[in-house]
Amino acid sequence: MHGALSLETIEPRAVLEDDVLTDLRVEDKDRAQELIEDLMIAANRVTVRYLEARSLPSLRRILRSPDRWQRIVELAAHLGARLPPEPDAAALEAFLLTRRQADPVRFPDLSLTVVKLIGRGEYVVEGPDQKTSPGHFGLAIPAYTHSTAPNRRFPDLLTQRLLKAALAEHRAQYSLEDLNTLAQHCTEQEDNASKVERRVQKSAAALLLESKIGQRFDAIVTGASAKGTWVRILHPSTEGRVVQGF
């Protein structure tokens, strides 16, 4: 999608054979998947614009301008690039594209660092009498919502209900107070789900590597400090802190 940050994070999926974990595999994204994602973003933008044009409330998906932008500037400087002193999505995207071409193997690690520094997304309510949405920094657009996956995300279901009421010219079944409460709840539950996902991924990695103690793997050092050295094993796709080595 034009203007969106070209980030590439690794999301390994568990491979099971007869209910036994045998691998953690990263599926390569093809152009068809990228096209589907672009269409979903376009649909979300049209949905929120439709509700806004009719002065109806909407549940916005936002990503604020990063408070830790200076850390991103320092990261870019360490890699020989310059970013402006104030948050600038277009400049960050140009930097990311350059780094993807220069070092594709380590680009996912850079992307993950940038994602952490930018911060998490949130849900907020926007309505005729409540203008609070700062837009979506990662997509570089002023108005965005989630609406294309009502089967697995409650915010999408809420938006579908608001859209259905608007199309039928009925009053929305949620007041602004209701929507504000639901927006906060959805943000909190998303954070909780993300924590569980990370713990499950770490548990799966530990379970898979338990039988591989003593083996050698190709890996990339992703970080080092007084607390230790962190590496990402290329295959199976896992990462963690080195606790013993030479």
Where do the PLM segments sit?
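Electropositive polyanion-binding surfaces
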Residues: 1-246
